[in-house]
Amino acid sequence: MNLNRFERYPLTFGPSPITPLKRLSEHLGGKVELYAKREDCNSGLAFGGNKTRKLEYLIPEAIEQGCDTLVSIGGIQSNQTRQVAAVAAHLGMKCVLVQENWVNYSDAVYDRVGNIEMSRIMGADVRLDAAGFDIGIRPSWEKAMSDVVERGGKPFPIPAGCSEHPYGGLGFVGFAEEVRQQEKELGFKFDYIVVCSVTGSTQAGMVVGFAADGRSKNVIGVDASAKPEQTKAQILRIARHTAELVELGREITEEDVVLDTRFAYPEYGLPNEGTLEAIRLCGSLEGVLTDPVYEGKSMHGMIEMVRRGEFPDGSKVLYAHLGGAPALNAYSFLFRNG
């Protein structure tokens, strides 16, 4: 496998830390050891997150092409768009963000706090759009790029989750290589890796990266899209393409992609009672914050897998904390009593 042939523009502090979740592990019976890899604090750029790791492999292309404007898309509380806005500010580029109405959630401050507030503070041109949630290329995003061209700029397109970009999976191939190095320092290997999946490139990169040591099927994606067929197909497509890019040496098959669909309900962006319990439990036991859209659902999934005995006793499980806590303010009504 050869990731080093791709140029990387450093936007993170370096390897994100792996920390034990001792109190949560003990609360759940102590038979499974839980750890977290903290992508939520991987950068000094507006709290970082998993998209910052991905952007390290996209930005060299933007610089090489002489682009002056990063154009991206997401929901109103998109972590992706906040991270793109931060990177644009860091590089001295302009930024146009299309923020679609992906979540059926009403709150008076939903479009004024959290991620979208930070994007505005960082100087992004934020455009609200009424379109609902879907995965893939969006007309509103294409129009935003056309607008940049019409006013004499040169846009660089960054799709939702970086996932439709040819290099969207590379960052999390790097994640797997980083984990392998950290495992040497820890003196053990993780038996399972749990990660939230929506647009697919995070899990796709992990599948490829861990396929290099035979652990692709140990990457357990927890769907948060509530459109699991689309998500799984996208993970597989991106993983196959990424495997070719890095010369993995074998084909990625459907069996390599494990996606748990039990925890996404009722729909994208809306938490269920299990999500909220997981957010409160992890916060109160570990001081680690997760969000109602992504990490709360994957944390719920991991907690339930432990409770149901789905991990063998003695397993060491790595939770990939991808970020997302900045969106908590947009859901403040749900936590008005804690």
Curated annotation (Swiss-Prot):
Active site: S78
Biological process (GO), any one: 1-aminocyclopropane-1-carboxylate metabolic process
Residues with PTM N6-(pyridoxal phosphate)lysine: K51
pH profile: Optimum pH is 8.0.
UniProt EC number: 3.5.99.7
Cleavable signal peptide: none
One example GO MF annotation: pyridoxal phosphate binding
Pfam families to which the protein is assigned, alphabetical: PALP
Gene3D superfamilies given in the database record: 3.40.50.1100
InterPro entries assigned to the protein according to its UniProt record, in alphabetical order: ACCD_DCysDesulf, ACP_carboxylate_deaminase, ACP_carboxylate_deaminase_bac, TrpB-like_PALP, TrpB-like_PALP_sf
Keywords in alphabetical order: Hydrolase, Pyridoxal phosphate
Superkingdom, taxonomy of origin: Bacteria
Record note on quaternary structure: Homotrimer.
Function in brief: Catalyzes a cyclopropane ring-opening reaction, the irreversible conversion of 1-aminocyclopropane-1-carboxylate (ACC) to ammonia and alpha-ketobutyrate. Allows growth on ACC as a nitrogen source.
Protein name as catalogued: 1-aminocyclopropane-1-carboxylate deaminase
Natural source organism: Pseudomonas putida (Arthrobacter siderocapsulatus)
Lineage, highest ranks first: Bacteria, Pseudomonadati, Pseudomonadota, Gammaproteobacteria, Pseudomonadales
Gene, per the UniProt record: acdS
